[in-house]
Swiss-Prot record:
Function noted in UniProt: Metallothioneins have a high content of cysteine residues that bind various heavy metals.
GO MF annotations in UniProt: metal ion binding
InterPro entries xrefs: Metalthion_15p
Pfam families: Metallothio_2 (PF01439)
Keyword Metal-binding: yes
UniProt keywords, alphabetically: Metal-binding, Metal-thiolate cluster
Protein name: Metallothionein-like protein type 2
UniProt lineage: Eukaryota, Viridiplantae, Streptophyta, Embryophyta, Tracheophyta
Family: Belongs to the metallothionein superfamily. Type 15 family.
Keyword Metal-binding applies: yes
Species of provenance: Brassica campestris (Field mustard)
């Protein structure tokens, strides 16, 4: 399992990819220098909090104004 859970992420130059290569949705939880062969991940789930001022574009990752749509294509490609 990738650290982004297989979710699409936007990288530099408005190139989309899978896993850790873009939005960094989940931090790298591995530690270097250890010789363990297994890792334990604990993820919690909480209800989303929304307010009337929330920006539109739900469900997309954003990186430098580059948005990645659900089909793993940049939408729109406006990286600066």
């Amino acid at each position: 399992m990738s650290c982004c859970g297989g979710n699409c992420g936007c990288g530099s130059g408005c190139k989309c990819g899978n896993g850790c290569g873009g939005c960094k949705m989940y931090p790298d939880l591995g530690f270097s220098g250890e010789s363990t062969t297994t890792e334990t991940f604990v993820f919690g789930v909480a209800p989303a909090m929304k307010n009337q001022y929330e920006a539109s574009g739900e469900g997309v990752a954003e990186n430098d104004a580059c948005k990645c749509g659900s089909d793993c294509k940049c939408d729109p490609c406006t990286c600066k």
